[in-house]
Amino acid sequence: MSGSKSVSPPGYAAQTAASPAPRGGPEHRAAWGEADSRANGYPHAPGGSTRGSTKRSGGAVTPQQQQRLASRWRGGDDDEDPPLSGDDPLVGGFGFSFRSKSAWQERGGDDGGRGSRRQRRGAAGGGSTRAPPAGGSGSSAAAAAAAGGTEVRPRSVEVGLEERRGKGRAAEELEPGTGTVEDGDGSEDGGSSVASGSGTGTVLSLGACCLALLQIFRSKKFPSDKLERLYQRYFFRLNQSSLTMLMAVLVLVCLVMLAFHAARPPLQVVYLAVLAAAVGVILIMAVLCNRAAFHQDHMGLACYALIAVVLAVQVVGLLLPQPRSASEGIWWTVFFIYTIYTLLPVRMRAAVLSGVLLSALHLAISLHTNAQDQFLLKQLVSNVLIFSCTNIVGVCTHYPAEVSQRQAFQETRECIQARLHSQRENQQQERLLLSVLPRHVAMEMKADINAKQEDMMFHKIYIQKHDNVSILFADIEGFTSLASQCTAQELVMTLNELFARFDKLAAENHCLRIKILGDCYYCVSGLPEARADHAHCCVEMGMDMIEAISSVREVTGVNVNMRVGIHSGRVHCGVLGLRKWQFDVWSNDVTLANHMEAGGKAGRIHITKATLNYLNGDYEVEPGCGGERNAYLKEHSIETFLILRCTQKRKEEKAMIAKMNRQRTNSIGHNPPHWGAERPFYNHLGGNQVSKEMKRMGFEDPKDKNAQESANPEDEVDEFLGRAIDARSIDRLRSEHVRKFLLTFREPDLEKKYSKQVDDRFGAYVACASLVFLFICFVQITIVPHSLFMLSFYLSCFLLLALVVFISVIYACVKLFPTPLQTLSRKIVRSKKNSTLVGVFTITLVFLSAFVNMFMCNSKNLVGCLAEEHNITVNQVNACHVMESAFNYSLGDEQGFCGSPQSNCNFPEYFTYSVLLSLLACSVFLQISCIGKLVLMLAIELIYVLIVEVPGVTLFDNADLLVTANAIDFSNNGTSQCPEHATKVALKVVTPIIISVFVLALYLHAQQVESTARLDFLWKLQATEEKEEMEELQAYNRRLLHNILPKDVAAHFLARERRNDELYYQSCECVAVMFASIANFSEFYVELEANNEGVECLRLLNEIIADFDEIISEDRFRQLEKIKTIGSTYMAASGLNDSTYDKAGKTHIKALADFAMKLMDQMKYINEHSFNNFQMKIGLNIGPVVAGVIGARKPQYDIWGNTVNVASRMDSTGVPDRIQVTTDMYQVLAANTYQLECRGVVKVKGKGEMMTYFLNGGPPLS
């Protein structure tokens, strides 16, 4: 057996000092005295005895000890301890309290509290590992917690609250420079990161840059078709909104085109019909696209239909209107191209093909209709440059937007995947936790963890008192013989087979298994819910156990049997200590039940008179004569009985119950119970279903929580994400979290986090805007007469923009440049304010380059010159007078007319087109808010329209006359005939309208982009928070789990989801085992009304065990593993796994010896300050053991073997206040200069005579 089965009560805890030093002044001794007095049922006077106030053991008190004492006992300097009220809530219910989550996240200093002192003590060293000081970094701690390196060592059983290394919310991590918005380089899955969270970037080679450039033009698609469909569903509502918005602006453009055509007769029916039909088709599509029946499969069809409509409008708009001009239709072609890239939800390839096709159509039709113009080449080259620029800007806008969307989707999916994985593991841990601790205990603990509780002087305990229960102890007789014939695996399998059956029987007989002690099994009926038939349940359980062991006897051929002892009475149940919790029961009645088993007979059920009274004569009994076989029963004059058989009445009742159970089973379609052995954790790790869905993410919980589990975790994530996408409401998310016009978050914290995001593509935005500047320069150099001012201005702007691009791009290539440049680049890119200012500066330069050459053009009014030449009024001048003029005015003539020395700018509309390109450059900067863009674009529009309408109006009036005249001359083929109504809509009228249309469209696009980005940020943030909440719960449950099972054992099962039916067993070559028992605690334990029927005694035992737990938690004892407590016996071992077993240096053996001596010192200190005389006996042994987990429904880790039995005998045959070791242990310790003395030969049960030794001290100090 693993140790003595004597179950004496527990309950008490303390802090471990670096040495057995006093725990403070008289008030601390008063505290111990009060605990001692209450435990023994006597009153306590706070100002009473101060015995030992000047007595010290262990010399002077170190500062670390003083800090520890202060935190252990009192938070202030009061002379009196707070009295323990007689109606302490711990008696009637679980008063066990925990620190709140905030306490174990950050233990700040509180006036007079223990939090700061405990932190200082932990920092000083020499104590157990504690929470880091407030304000310290928790990253390493979090990593340690995640790796399972920290076990729960709660203060007041605070369940790891002091050791929590909880990760902060993702929202708290969204600081400047963390690179939360990653860049994509065009990979198939949405782009890889070019993040710069650490301030370092990636050095890109020329080849990599070229590949990245080529990747831009590739359509993005996830490798998995299912994932791609999910992505399309993810953005379906947003794409639907974009499509609707595009249709609206297209209708607006068509109406503007109709208005322009109607303003210049004669009207062309075909033109009007096509545009009207286009408007009608677009409106019908808009209605259809917003119907409920419209879904993702229809999106592509609608997009391509819209492209077809745009192409039709493009062809008709260029072929039919008069007067003809190669510059006609440029503005709407640019508009169509750009909106296809930005508002039409199509792939990059389709957008590029559409843009190129629209550009080619315009160029081809212009070439066809204006072939006779001598200046056509200039216009075509300029048009090519404008369309090329528009396509490039469209690509520069479409690419990062799609990459950002795909990345947001991927990151959200990864958050959900991690959350579901954490949730599955968390559910496994919770099932495992609830399999070890009864639900009411575990739930009470978890409730107290989240509740704020004030620090108390002593550790709190969970103790519940239950009257009228029956306790069953059962021991396998002949287990030693069985174990000697089995291998390690066979032994674990056999025990698991047997105890699995016992667990099933316990469930069927309404018994709660308490613990397995080696080959001893004990359970209680009447817990946690009271039952009137608790005695019947225990008797039936005993009969079934005896029947079950018979099958083992038949299969193995070993003479094994069961001794069963039952007693009915009162118990205290709960957990004790700080580590390796095991639910247990304590009371004098439990002790009596244990002795009933020891004094029983093999194959028989041994009951007391109290149990017999509860059986109501349903069983035939005979005298048990237990006193003849057990001294305890004889000493206490316990009348015992042996069950013979149940009466006929009881047989009929059992048959009726069995029949009802069968009917209930058949009615619900269950299969008959399977009697094969279950595997540990099989019942607790098998489920992968999702128990709750994400909340606060804009969608409701799924209704069907019993959906079939997905065999593939990836499929489960996709299914979950699909349900989330279907359930989320974009409109509701937007209305709840985002303001309508400003598009700012309603919550200031959210807005602050969003504003701190870093856009690593800022350098690309500046580069794209600079590229627009170059195109504008080339357009104007081609179409506008050259001047020195033009060249000097463009060169200056180019140098400035090159510098801005250089500084901005350094951010992604920081390793190549000096530190000052890196710092400057980082300050610009990582600050939204600075990057916005730089962006505005860049756009301003581009805008200036678009119109500044207007001031170098001839400003003479051609209308005035013609009126003077023809001797007519200004209002009478028309295009015919241009044709009739003697000066041969023409569009191709750049010589200044009317005697002006300045050159003619006969195509001022290209200034407007250049301004449109500058507006497109504004839209490239995705990090600028839509309101900021609107203000900037309105400023550009206002300035340019004022220039057009005031100083530059003559340029546009002159151009109108020349274009009309050129068209008339072409249509007349050289004749002098002049039409009556040869006119066109004036450019000074057209210009404000088309710029306003562009500003509106670009604002709507900016609003759509920012709205999408904010919703993506919100959804990802909420998904991340959900994931981190689950990870925190998972980490917490893992610490709870590690407080029940060794870390390597828990990891073994939790990491093998698909192999959870394997048994866990391990043969350990050389393990040191310790049993430490308080020999006279049973004498101390009394059940009186004054001490709450023994609860105060258990409180004292809890303090002692907690002190031992804190000692074993110290770093120097990291090789040790607490196995369990058995009443007042503390069991530990070292060298149970590869990380703690030191084959060469035997350090794990020395560590256990040091631990044993530390416990002795601690017990002396406790006696001094609690005014008690507890005597501790400790036994040590080394040798091979078998470690494993047994029990399917309530898995329990334990060790077995001869080594364990002998260590237990070293304890039971030991001498009070001495540490007894075996010869094997002696040889190792003596070789390391430990101080030992020979005790002599001792008779050991089952082993005969053994030579033993006493451990007196460690190696002498050098």
Swiss-Prot record:
Domain remark text: The protein contains two modules with six transmembrane helices each; both are required for catalytic activity. Isolated N-terminal or C-terminal guanylate cyclase domains have no catalytic activity, but when they are brought together, enzyme activity is restored. The active site is at the interface of the two domains. Both contribute substrate-binding residues, but the catalytic metal ions are bound exclusively via the N-terminal guanylate cyclase domain.
Modified sites of kind Phosphoserine: S97, S156, S667, S755
Topology of this chain in the membrane: Multi-pass membrane protein
Composition-biased stretches (Basic and acidic residues): 25-37, 152-172
Location(s), subcellular: Cell membrane; Cell projection, Cilium
EC category name: lyase
Cofactor or coenzyme needed: Mg(2+); Mn(2+)
Gene that specifies this protein: Adcy5
EC identifiers of the protein: 4.6.1.1
Low complexity: bias regions: 47-59, 129-150
GO cellular component terms listed in the entry, alphabetical order: cilium; endosome; membrane; plasma membrane; sarcolemma
Binding-site positions, Mg(2+) 1: D475, D519
Biological process terms in GO annotation: adenylate cyclase-activating dopamine receptor signaling pathway; adenylate cyclase-activating G protein-coupled receptor signaling pathway; adenylate cyclase-inhibiting dopamine receptor signaling pathway; cAMP biosynthetic process; cellular response to forskolin; G protein-coupled adenosine receptor signaling pathway; heart development; intracellular signal transduction
This protein's name: Adenylate cyclase type 5
Family that this chain belongs to: Belongs to the adenylyl cyclase class-4/guanylyl cyclase family.
Cytoplasmic topological domain residue ranges: 1-242, 396-763, 1006-1262
Function: Catalyzes the formation of the signaling molecule cAMP in response to G-protein signaling. Mediates signaling downstream of ADRB1. Regulates the increase of free cytosolic Ca(2+) in response to increased blood glucose levels and contributes to the regulation of Ca(2+)-dependent insulin secretion.
Annotated keywords: ATP-binding, cAMP biosynthesis, Cell membrane, Cell projection, Cilium, Glycoprotein, Lyase, Magnesium, Membrane, Metal-binding, Methylation, Nucleotide-binding, Phosphoprotein, Repeat, Transmembrane, Transmembrane helix
Annotated Guanylate cyclase domain residues: 470-597, 1072-1211
Region (Disordered): 1-196
